[in-house]
């Protein structure tokens, strides 16, 4: 997965390498551009072959005048606290989760969604929480605002 300059065909940045394709699901990739097109958030999904567990991740790229620089998000991002019916917790089977970029705010902050999906007694519980990342002048990322977890249940 590459960002390519339209006029020249020059590769501006490689987001995923060919060696990553065994785990990488290109159909689930998302690019979220800032209004000035000087920053882009890249969301991706991968899962090991033959395994239903899905992992989502994101990275951010900033324009430096001649290309894009990758900026990785903080390691300990907020994780949703999935809610289970009273007395029904335990014996959960994880199905994955991770973060997905949603939108750039006018302030230059990035809004993301964090998901955690588990199976419990024949039902799928998905905890979702939104949070905001801010960037300093050197593009160091930090968590700024964390919302509340919403739990969805499906069969």
Positions of the model-derived regions?
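Beta-propeller domains
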Residues: 1-14
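Surface-exposed loop and turn segments in beta-propeller and other repeat-based domains
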Residues: 12-23, 70-93, 148-155
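Blade-terminus and WD-like Trp-Asp/Gly-His loop motifs, strongest in beta-propeller folds
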Residues: 25, 29-39, 96, 100-111
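Beta-strand C-termini and the immediately following turn/loop, strongest in propeller blades
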Residues: 42-48, 112-117
């Amino acid at each position: 997965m590459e960002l390519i300059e339209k006029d020249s065909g020059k590769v501006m940045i490689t987001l995923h390498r060919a060696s990553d394709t065994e785990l990488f699901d290109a159909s689930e990739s998302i690019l979220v551009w800032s209004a000035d097109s000087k920053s882009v958030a890249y969301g991706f999904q991968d899962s090991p072959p033959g395994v239903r567990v899905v992992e989502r991740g994101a990275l951010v790229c900033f324009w430096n005048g001649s290309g894009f620089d990758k900026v990785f998000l903080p390691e300990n991002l907020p994780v949703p606290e999935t809610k289970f019916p009273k007395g029904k917790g335990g014996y959960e089977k994880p199905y994955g989760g991770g973060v997905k970029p949603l939108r750039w705010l006018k302030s230059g902050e990035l809004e993301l969604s964090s998901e955690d999906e588990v199976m419990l007694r024949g039902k799928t519980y998905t905890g979702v929480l939104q949070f905001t990342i801010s960037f300093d002048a050197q593009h160091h990322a930090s968590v700024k605002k964390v919302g509340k977890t919403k739990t969805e249940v499906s069969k």
